Regions:
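Short, solvent-exposed beta-strand edge segments and adjacent coil->beta transition regions
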Residues: 24, 65-69, 155
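Helical "substrate-binding/catalytic lid" subdomain
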Residues: 101-220
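Short clusters of hydrophobic/aromatic residues that line enzyme substrate/ligand-binding pockets
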Residues: 7, 93-96, 151, 158
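Short glycine-enriched loops at secondary-structure junctions
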Residues: 3-4, 57-58, 143-147
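Rossmann-fold NAD(P) dinucleotide-binding segment
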Residues: 3-51
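Proline-centered loop/turn at the N-terminus of a beta-strand
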Residues: 25, 50, 69, 189-191
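Rossmann-fold dinucleotide-binding core
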Residues: 31-114
C-alpha cells in the first residue's frame, strides 16, 4: 500500500468487513512511519490479530523472481509462524527485533540507496561531460570496488535514458520523508539524505514522478 493513509484505511475496513479468525497473522509489507506502526498495534490489539511489520527490498525484479529481502519487526513467535509464507516470494527474511524495527531497517536501506543513486548520477554526469564511452565505463567499473546492485542494474538504463519501470520516485520521496521525520526525533542531521529528498520532491511535479528512482539523474542534468 502506498502510504500511512492507505494502510490505515485498508485495515479499518478489513476489521469491519472481513470474517477473520482469532490470532490471524497480519504481515504488513508496506513502508510506513513508526507512528503508523503504533496506530496499527492499537487497532489490532482488540480483535487479537497477530501483527508483524515486514517491509521489503529488491524492487520489481525481486518480486517477479521471488528473491525479495524482507526485514521483520515483531514477536519472534509470530515471525516464525509467518516465515513459511514469506519464503514463497523471498530468499532472505531476517527478524530484526521488536515491532517497528522492520521499518527502521528499511529506512536504513533507503538511506543507502538514495546515497548510492546520487553518487551514480554524479558519476554519469562527470563521465558524460568528459565524453567518455559509457559502455566502456560500465564494463570497466562493474566488477570493481565502485560497483553495487544499483550500478550494475541502473547505470545501463541511465545511459539509455530509460526510466519507465521500477520503484517510483513518488514512493522513494514518501519513504525518505518518513526517514527524515524519525531522524529529526533523534536529533540526527542526515545532510545527504535530505538533499536527495529535496531533489526527489522536485521531480514530483514532472513525468518522473512515476518513473524509477534512477531518474534522480534528471535532477542533475536536465
Amino acid at each position: 500500500l502506498k502510504d500511512d493513509n492507505a494502510v490505515n484505511s485498508f485495515y479499518k475496513k478489513f476489521i469491519k468487513t472481513t470474517n477473520y479468525k482469532r490470532n490471524t497473522a497480519i504481515i504488513e509489507h508496506s513502508t510506513i512511519s513508526l507512528h503508523q506502526i503504533e496506530l496499527l498495534t492499537k487497532l489490532f490489539s482488540k480483535p487479537k490479530l497477530k501483527f508483524i511489520d515486514a517491509p521489503v527490498t529488491g524492487g520489481e525484479e525481486g518480486a517477479k523472481k521471488g528473491s525479495l529481502s524482507v526485514m521483520v519487526g515483531g514477536d519472534k513467535l509470530n515471525f516464525n509462524k509467518s516465515k513459511k509464507i514469506i519464503s514463497v516470494y523471498s530468499n532472505n527474511c531476517t527478524h530484526i527485533g521488536k515491532l517497528g524495527s522492520g521499518q527502521l531497517a528499511k529506512f536504513t536501506n533507503q538511506i543507502l540507496i538514495c546515497g548510492i543513486l546520487y553518487s551514480i548520477s554524479e558519476a554519469f554526469q562527470f563521465s558524460r561531460k568528459n565524453k567518455l564511452d559509457q559502455n566502456k565505463i560500465f564494463n570497466a567499473l562493474k566488477n570493481g570496488a565502485a560497483s553495487s546492485w544499483q550500478f550494475t542494474n541502473r547505470y545501463p538504463t541511465i545511459v539509455k535514458n530509460k526510466f519507465d519501470f521500477g520503484f517510483s520516485t513518488e514512493l522513494m520521496t514518501k519513504d525518505l520523508k518518513y526517514v527524515l521525520q524519525h531522524a529529526k526525533k533523534l536529533d540526527l542531521n542526515l545532510k545527504l539524505t535530505r538533499s536527495v529528498y529535496e531533489k526527489y520532491k522536485k521531480l514530483q511535479s514532472t513525468v518522473y514522478k512515476n518513473y524509477d528512482t534512477s531518474s534522480l539523474v534528471k535532477s542533475l542534468i536536465d
